[in-house]
Curated annotation (Swiss-Prot):
Organism of derivation: Arabidopsis thaliana (Mouse-ear cress)
Protein name as catalogued: Putative E3 ubiquitin-protein ligase XBAT31
Source lineage: Eukaryota, Viridiplantae, Streptophyta, Embryophyta, Tracheophyta
PROSITE patterns the UniProt entry points to: ANK_REP_REGION (PS50297), ANK_REPEAT (PS50088), ZF_RING_2 (PS50089)
Cited SUPFAM superfamilies: Ankyrin repeat, RING/U-box
EC number from the UniProt entry: 2.3.2.27
Pathway membership: Protein modification; protein ubiquitination
Domain of life: Eukaryota
Length: 456
């Protein structure tokens, strides 16, 4: 590993060069005339042709080779599988192909005892993270080891994939992992500082996007590491003022995604996107308030105090709670409708405990029936009986989770959505660190450096 290979070198070197550059004609010829060459490995790191094909994203050659090799989990010098290298380099087609033929997603390397999921999260390949997690749900791992256990699998320093993603400033991976059941408040043994949570590591790296996402999933700002430090102290120690401002225990609590609610986990993609965008907007408002007048003010999506489309809709389409936003969410089976912002206020009036698996679902503010399902509202101007309008304006009592009559008619932000941080979808991601290429060690040279990738 770490040495470029020329087609003019020895035959076993030439086969690796052919794989690397995608010369499928040569590979077919070798398979027909000199198949023993396919059993060769590179001189130092002992990469097989499967490793080289996977790392270089040569999906056609990889597929061809997998027809010959009965074992897709060949090991190199560091006990890394082809699937690990595909995940490391973000070769999504190779990741999917290897998973399809039964590559073991539960193999551990000998460098840091990491799996392919650790590699994908560490290097920021969210699509590979998702593909591996999808494979885990349908593989024997889910049956014999447990899907939740796999998502939160630890390396030899006690780091889960979520810890690595947060430390390496990978907000998209953080989002996928949290959405798949990663424990937001899990502590490391020795990775980073002993006892670090993902929030400690995001604070240390200064990734405000990761901080936002973790807070939105209920990360505890007051949880301490083994040295007694809360994430705020870690952020300020490393001079990440914007992160520190959001993590300051004296600042307003963020609005938290109500993941413990069963109907939230069952949302279809369209309804989930609407609610996530509402959460993003609410927490952006909270950020603007916290950072106002500081040197850390951040750009936020621009929007006016009144919706541009207000003049184009009839009163019957407006949310009967805030009278400001168009109804976009419908409660099944009663059919009552609300805007996404008021729906979140109803579901999130209490911050969920990340360790709680079940909570009492909220009730519809109009008919008091228990909410079991939320879908995107299908507004129809000609069907006024579905509007479920009220004679009085109703407001959500966030403390009691109740609804009462009132003359309240404020902007949606007055429903205290802005009290509480985290954009969810559509946020710009922090640029990844430059990759350090080495001569094949595959190790982490220091705590604050990227793991060396092999040059293949």
């Amino acid at each position: 590993m770490g040495q470029s290979m020329s087609c003019g070198s020895r035959p076993e070197h030439g086969i690796f060069a052919s794989v690397q550059c995608g010369d499928i004609i040569t590979i077919r010829r070798v398979m027909a005339t000199e198949p023993s060459l396919l059993n060769q490995t590179t001189p130092y790191d002992r990469h097989s042709v499967l490793h080289v094909a996977a790392a270089n994203g040569q999906i056609e050659i990889l597929s061809l080779l997998l027809e010959r090799f009965t074992n897709p989990d060949l090991l190199n010098r560091h006990k890394q599988t082809p699937l690990m290298l595909a995940a490391m380099y973000g070769r999504i087609s190779c990741v999917k192909k290897l998973a399809e033929v039964g590559a073991n997603i539960l193999m551990f390397d000998s460098v840091n005892r990491r799996t392919c999921l650790h590699y994908a999260a560490y290097y920021g390949h969210a699509n590979c993270v998702q593909a591996i997690l999808s494979a885990a749900q349908s593989s024997p791992v889910a049956v014999h080891w447990g899907y939740a256990r796999f998502v939160n699998i630890r390396d030899d320093k006690g780091a889960t994939p979520l810890h690595l993603a947060a430390r390496q400033r990978r907000p998209e991976c953080v989002n996928v992992l949290l959405d798949s059941g990663s424990l937001v408040c899990a502590s490391t043994s020795v990775y980073g500082s002993p006892g670090s949570t993902p929030l400690h590591l995001a604070a240390r790296s200064g990734s405000i996007d990761c901080v936002r996402k973790l807070l939105a999933w209920g990360a505890d700002r007051l949880q301490r590491d083994a040295s007694g430090r809360i994430p705020y102290v870690v952020a300020m120690k490393h001079k990440h003022g914007a992160c520190g401002a959001l993590l300051n225990p004296s600042s307003a609590e963020p609005l938290v995604w109500p993941s413990p609610l069963k109907f939230i986990s069952e949302l279809n993609d369209e309804a989930k996107l609407l609610l996530e965008q509402a959460l993003m907007e609410a927490n952006r408002e909270r950020e603007k308030t916290i950072l106002k007048g500081t040197a850390y003010s951040l750009p936020s999506p621009s929007f006016s105090d009144t919706d541009d489309n207000m003049s184009e809709v009839s009163d019957t389409e407006l949310c009967c709670i805030c009278f400001e936003q168009v109804c976009t969410i419908e409660v099944k089976d009663c059919g009552h409708q609300m805007c996404a912002q008021c729906t979140l206020a109803l579901c999130c009036h209490n911050k969920p405990n990340p360790t709680t698996s079940t909570v009492t679902p909220p009730v519809c503010p109009f008919c008091r029936s228990t909410i079991a399902c939320l879908v995107v509202a299908q507004n129809n101007n000609n069907n006024n009986e579905k509007s479920k309008s009220l004679d009085d304006v109703v407001v959500v009592d966030r403390e009691a989770g109740d609804v009462s009559s009132s003359k309240f008619r404020k902007h949606r932000r007055s429903i205290n959505l802005g009290e509480e941080s985290s954009s969810f979808m559509g946020l710009s991601t922090i640029g990844s660190f430059g990759r350090i290429t080495g001569r094949g060690s595959g190790r982490i040279a220091a705590e604050n450096e990227l793991m060396d990738k092999p040059i293949l």
